[in-house]
């Protein structure tokens, strides 16, 4: 069985841990708990192929900037996450996460993931953003950013409702099993 290492990065509180817990346990966790490296392992079938998917959670907070890259070696695919209702987390994909991932892993495939899809149409959330002269991130905006960072795919999901959730991980596996023809075969990430 092929083992795939998938590392999830993004700002603190965008829902990385909820994404992983909801996917692996089919249950949405309660309160927000900042993360320091939790690992999950799941045996899954994608396109009739059994895969052992190793899921590596990371801490988005700046306090962990020096520690986080220790989880990057031998990564097969990255999920760079931002919250669809946090324009700052969207901007940080460009400003922080993409440069960090590419610095350590120049050719590892990336999937861009917009989280908290259930809140994009939530009236209270929209109102709170409007008070700050902000708005939720739209699908075309996500697509444009994915193109800019040369992401394999752009996907949106909700860990709460599980909408689009399975697709995120299926596509992460496909990005490794069936690399895009325009890309040369990727070497796993390594830090020297």
UniProtKB/Swiss-Prot annotation:
Record keywords, A-Z: Acetylation, Cytoplasm, GTP-binding, Hydrolase, Lipoprotein, Membrane, Methylation, Nucleotide-binding, Prenylation
Enzyme Commission designation: 3.6.5.2
Q: Which residues carry this modification: N6-acetyllysine?
A: 147
Q: List the disulfide bonds.
A: none
Span(s) of short sequence motif Effector region? 32-40
Q: What is the reaction catalyzed?
A: GTP + H2O = GDP + phosphate + H(+)
Q: How does it sit in the membrane?
A: Lipid-anchor
Q: Which GO terms describe its molecular function?
A: GTP binding; GTPase activity; protein kinase binding
Q: Name one GO cellular component term.
A: cytoskeleton
- Give a Pfam family name: Ras
- Record protein name field: Ras-related C3 botulinum toxin substrate 2
Organism this protein belongs to: Bos taurus (Bovine)
